[in-house]
Each structure stands twice: as C-alpha cells, then as structure tokens.
C-alpha cells in the first residue's frame, strides 16, 4: 500500500459521528511544498485534527466552494494559464466522503489572470469567478450534475482608481457574493474602492449598479446576514469592516458603520483577509495579516451594527482564511506563512475564541472549507 492509499485509509478510519471533513486550498509553488487540495478531519469532541492527506492534485487551488448537495467541490486555479489558454481556471471535483478523496470532473478556462475568488449562487445554477489581475468577473453555467459549462459572460470592472498606491494601481475584483434571495451578485473591487452589483440572466452577468466605499479602503471579501438585510465587507487596505443595509427590493446598499479590526494605537503593518458570520448570526469574525490575529465582533440584534469583543492571535503567520464549523462550535484558521492550521473553540453565547492548541501542518494553506456531516 503506497503512502497516499495508507493516508486515505487512515482518514476513513477517523470518520465518525464525531468528526467533520474539511478541505484546505493552497498555493502550489515551484518547490513542490504543496501539491493541491488537502483533506483533514476535525474531531468535534476534542478539536484535534487528523493528519492532512492530499485529496487532489491541482495548480494553486486558492479558493474553494461547495455545491449545496455537499457532493461536489469547486476550486479556482490561481495561475496564468490553464489548458494552454491564458488565465486561471475553474474546476469541479466529486467528493468521496468516506475517504476525503476528490475525483476531478472538469476544468474550464476563465480567460482572466490570477483568479482570486469564486462564488456559487444559492440555486446552484451559476459559478462566478473574480480575476484579481485581469480586472474582470466571469460566469459559468452549472449543469444539473454540477459540472461546469463553458464561460457565457465576462464583465470588465472599470472606474477611477483608489488613492492607495501601489495596491490600487488598476481594477482588482477580489470576491463574489450572492444575495441570499438569489437575485443579485456583489463583487468587491480592491483597486477601485467599489462594490459592483450584477443580476443573472440565464447565467449571464448583467450590470446593475455600483456602490462606493471609503477612499483607500480596498474592499476584499463580503458576507450577508442570513436574512439578507445586512452586508458586511472587510476592507483589506485600511483594516476595517463596513456594515451596509441592503434594500430588500432594489438591492441597493447604504453604509451604516465602519469599525477597525486592529487594537487601538496599533501602528504596525497589517491588512485584512477573510470575514465570516457565526451560524447563529450573532457574531462576525475577521482576520488580520501582519498583526496575525482574529477580531471578534458582536452583531446588534436589531440594526446589525458591530461592537468589538476581542482580538486574539491567529496561532500562526498570515491568517489568509478561516471558517466556522456548521454547528458554530469550532473555528479553523489557515495561516499561510507558518504553513499550519489552528483550531479554536467558539463560545456560542459570547462569540469568544479559545485556542485549543490543536494544529496541523499544511503548506501554503489559504482556504478552509467544511463539508457538513449530513452531506
């Protein structure tokens, strides 16, 4: 039995009602430290992680998404060429839940250089990728079996550049977020200090307005509240989280609040990365790279504004991504520069994080994706 087969077998033996399958996206540098997407299991009683195993070889699968059926995983390829064509790619994989192994299904070229993020609409009909260096977003229809069809639309993002150089040197779309009602797509552009809104017509992106952020903010990622009334945007460059009210009819955004993710008086270098809402809707979490920390906020039950609870060390260097378990009891953070995952216990009443000391080595870890146990 070769090493990969042995590790798959070991991963399968750890599967129980008290374990949770997690996939980790990575950068795959030329030195071969990482080879693609890794699978690991979280013991939901102790917080311990199993030894990571390579689930599928892939070129810089730096962001992952899950089909609503829990059986198909989508990954972007943050590369300059795919299948002999310039630009990144979008791939789909069949999940083998017992072992964590991923079987490649298809791969489509995006035509955009350096893809940074992908989003799947709630109805599982369309996949949209943001090309950070290509300055565009591209949409792909999804077939009934979850496979990705060829691209059907590409929208360039244009407008005046933000004031923060050199980062705001051109358009830099950084994320794709669908409204919970499946009506709109929101794209954060770090280079333009704007949030672009689109509608979908048979998977074709149709421009539907833009919304300005604070100059130099550098909007990166966003998350909706479950009811769709609030959109939370983490701004990479000025290390803040902005709260927007979202009109239920028009989808228009109105700025309500901006809060810092850093301690008062901190003067070191840092920039934000990921933002998540707790499954119970009461807390918001954001990561700081440089300060290497996780900021925890309470959501006001009526107006959705945020108040800082705590800022805790991320357990490594450059926390580019993290995710909460579906039951909200655990948070797993991917620290890219220290090549590790760190597990935190989440208090569902206060939102506070407790470092468990449980960690696992994953080279260039940059994305964390939980697969619900009932998938």
Outline where the language-model segments fall.
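Short, solvent-exposed loop/turn segments at conserved positions within beta-propeller repeat blades
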Residues: 30-35, 82-88, 132-135, 169, ...
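A short beta-strand motif characteristic of beta-propeller blades
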Residues: 50-56, 103-108, 161-166, 206-212, ...
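Blade-level signature of beta-propeller repeat domains, shared across WD40, Kelch, NHL, RCC1
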Residues: 336-375
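Beta-rich, blade/repeat-based domains predominating
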Residues: 31-34, 58-68, 111-126, 158-182, ...
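Short loop/turn segments immediately following beta-strands, especially the blade-tip
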Residues: 40-47, 93-100, 139-150, 198-204, ...
